[in-house]
Amino acid sequence: MIPALIVPILNQPELLVKMLASINQPVEQIIVIDNGRAIGESHPPLVGCGVEATTVHLPCNLGVAASWNLGIKLTPHAPYWLIVNHDIEFGLGDLARLEEQIDPREAGVWLIFGLAAFAITRHTINAVGFFDEGIHPAYNEDLDFMRRVDLLGLPRHEVGFTGTHVGSATIHSDPVLRAANGFTHAANDRYYERKWGGPKLGGETFSTPFNRGGHMGDWRLDLETLRANAWPRR
């Protein structure tokens, strides 16, 4: 049984319903982080593989990294977490392969479909640290995490994926959010470059965050960044 599944959402709850319906392996806990009041009080119960999801309703967009971190903190006893985008639909056998391949005693990352659907263990978090909430509200938090994974020499396991992924569904469905992302994505690129001494995907020069020689989980939550990068409420 998959111990915990975490999925943030900002809009398009119909895609979330499809994702949950595609879960074809038992899951102990499903945590939905609702960042945009997408799931109203009158919405039918969210169910995946017979398990009713716990929905955390937030008054504003916490951001991807903070949502993933919150899901982990809400299920601290889980040996591992499956973290997914709401616009994924799993294929038959995808989650069964994950259960066959994952070793909760190991630190690493199990990639079902890149960082749109992946699993990490408590040992991964202990080694790598939590997701960097200074990257807000979305884009680059996955690259930053995998940069730390790779620097520590932790393995990437390719589980395989036979399902479907819409891709960037949140911003493509809303021109206001798409415009806001144009600003915040560039701001997150600049933050990433400060943190790693160069641009993402090959230009990095630092081997520790901010070249400070500390733990890989070294990051700073900056209130000014949260204010500047906040997307409009929808």
Features from the language model and the residues they span:
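Short, well-formed alpha-helical segments that are part of the catalytic scaffolds
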Residues: 11-25
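A conserved acidic beta->alpha catalytic loop
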Residues: 22, 32-45, 88-89
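Short beta-strand/loop segment that forms part of the nucleotide-sugar
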Residues: 28-37, 56-58
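Glycine-rich, basic loop-to-helix element that forms the pyrophosphate-binding segment
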Residues: 58-75
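Short beta-strand-to-loop acidic/aromatic patch adjacent to the donor-nucleotide binding site
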Residues: 78-89
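Conserved donor-nucleotide/metal-binding helix-loop-beta segment in metal-dependent transferases, i.e.
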Residues: 95-109
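Conserved nucleotide-sugar donor-binding
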Residues: 116-129
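C-terminal catalytic/acceptor-binding lobe
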Residues: 137, 143-234
